[in-house]
Each structure stands twice: as structure tokens, then as C-alpha cells.
Amino acid sequence: AYRDASSSPVPVMMAFEGVGPTSFYPEDWKCYGFDQNAEAAAEMFSVMTGKEVTAEMFGTAEYDELVKDASALLWVNEDTVPTVMAYGQHDKFQPYEGSVRLDKALTENGVPHEYIVLPHSGHGLQNDNRLYAEYMAKVEEYLNKYMSE
């Protein structure tokens, strides 16, 4: 939604997601050890993006441009649509650390958003029933607010 909102043939008014891809910075993928092994990070991110990534690219503008299509974080600006998002703090599939970075970018750009962290859950958002219900209520609230205009 962030990448295509301005060019979509259907108006994108808001986004909601649970445990969606956020960023491809090795330091956000500690659970895989990618913060300690740049070569392994480059191999995995090559598979995930379908583009050749090398360890030497990390931290460069070239790298950001290469992974931009797959990284929600790199599309955030002041025109980003309002967002509701939920992440499990113990997620090993889409590491939680990237969601912290996405929340910060949305905040810094003044994007209306709700960031719900489920502290006992992994990728399935399965161990925090009250917070999951809060997430679903926020999705409904945002749908009513932004989709009824």
C-alpha cells in the first residue's frame, strides 16, 4: 500500500497489517544472527527480494534502492496512508525490531497510525488475546473513519 498508494487505480485510503514486512537491515534480524553475519544476511535478503545483495552494500543508498520494493519502511513519507499494525515481540519470521523502526518513521512523518505490540506473541499473534482484540477494534475504527469518506 505504501509503494503504490499514489498510483493505484483504486484509491488507497488506509492500510492495516499484522506482522508484515518492514525493513531489510541486518541489525533488525538479530534472531537470525544477521547482525553478526553480513554474508548470511546478504544471501537471505537476495532470496527475499529476488535481487543480488552483497554484504558490502549494507548501509549504502544503493542497498536501500535495491530493497525498496520489498521494504515498507523505505516508502514512508508525509503522504503515507493512515495505518494500523500489530507485531508479536517474539516473532522469528518477521523480526519485531523492524516494526519498531517502521513505527518511528510513521511517527516522524506525522502519519496517523496505531502500533500494537503483542509482548507474548510470535508471528501468529496468538498469545495476547486482549491486545489482538484491540488490534481488530482499531482496524474497524480506521475502516469506518477512512473508508467512509
Residue ranges and their predicted role:
Residues 79, 85-87, 91:
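Short beta-strand/loop motif that positions the catalytic acidic residue
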Residues 1-32:
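Primarily recognizes the serine-hydrolase "nucleophile elbow" in alpha/beta-hydrolase
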Residues 131-149:
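Catalytic active-site module of serine/aspartate enzymes centered on a nucleophile-bearing elbow/loop
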